[in-house]
């Protein structure tokens, strides 16, 4: 595992800031246990510094993963967030969408969020902003990108797309071979 380069850090933080904004500092500057981001085989891991120091005794080729996988870099050097980062993204998310019970299953099967499925949405959510999708009982289901702003949402027809699907907890089953 190695630290991220300047370009990798910039790309990663830009993607992460789309969902949690300035709360990135809460991920790194934790008073209880300091954490850092490390790269291993194009995947970015969120690791406690204590666990990272212990892992130095493991050979690089033998190390499969360490910490929480936040996502991976594509071959074109773009960053793609994984569903494994949902717990941390949901904890610090700025914008949220709550879907009704009739919209949970379509979202968990990989479909976009429609207006008919929206129960609530955070006020003043801009267009093309990263959002965390919740069930009505505040269980995080996944995350996506808004297709419309909150103001435009009010006058849309029920079949219009509100948020584009990025990742959902159903991926643990659908992509279990390639996820980790």
Curated annotation (Swiss-Prot):
Pfam family for this entry, one: UPF0113
Record-level GO BP terms: assembly of large subunit precursor of preribosome; ribosomal large subunit biogenesis
Gene Ontology MF: a single term: RNA binding
Alphabetical list of Gene3D superfamilies matching this protein: 3.10.450.220, PUA domain (2.30.130.10)
Domain PUA: 94-170
Cell compartments where the protein resides: Cytoplasm; Nucleus, Nucleolus
Keywords: Cytoplasm, Nucleus, Ribosome biogenesis, RNA-binding
SUPFAM superfamilies: Pre-PUA domain, PUA domain-like
Signal peptide start-end: none
Self-association and partners: Interacts with pre-ribosome complex.
Summary of the function given for this chain in its UniProt record: Required for proper 27S pre-rRNA processing and 60S ribosome subunit assembly.
Family: Belongs to the NIP7 family.
Protein name according to UniProt: 60S ribosome subunit biogenesis protein nip7
Organism: Schizosaccharomyces pombe (strain 972 / ATCC 24843) (Fission yeast)
Lineage of the species this protein comes from: Eukaryota, Fungi, Dikarya, Ascomycota, Taphrinomycotina
Gene: nip7
